Amino acid sequence: PKTIVYFLMLFFTFHSCSKEDTNTDDNNPNTHTNTITTWAHTFQPSTLNCYIGDTIYFDLGGSHNAIEVSEDSYNNNDPTPIENGFEFGYGQSGIFIPVDPKTYYYVCVPHLPEMKAKIIVQ
């Protein structure tokens, strides 16, 4: 009888202390935080490689903005924003979390053609 009681005590102690796996897409330990800043008339880094779900923090200087554009607009130094793309105003900070594996192109409107960059998401 005492052996059974001890066994049950140990069983419930270990069972109550075990941790349930709560890893979901919203709580993914494999995601990373990346920061994009401005320096003179450039984004730093000019090309960022990351993964779906990573957090990308934009920290823009006062005379810079960042708007997402199409690849065509990017290549032609055209600041036309794409529909439903990300946009951060002059001197703003903000977060962008990519949900699609593709290349996101963005520019600083007043500093084209020098100030443009891309985010490559795998």
What is each stretch, according to the model?
Residues 13-16:
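C-terminal motif of bacterial Sec signal peptides marking the signal peptidase cleavage site
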Residues 10-11, 101:
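Residue-level signal for mature regions of secreted extracellular proteins and peptides
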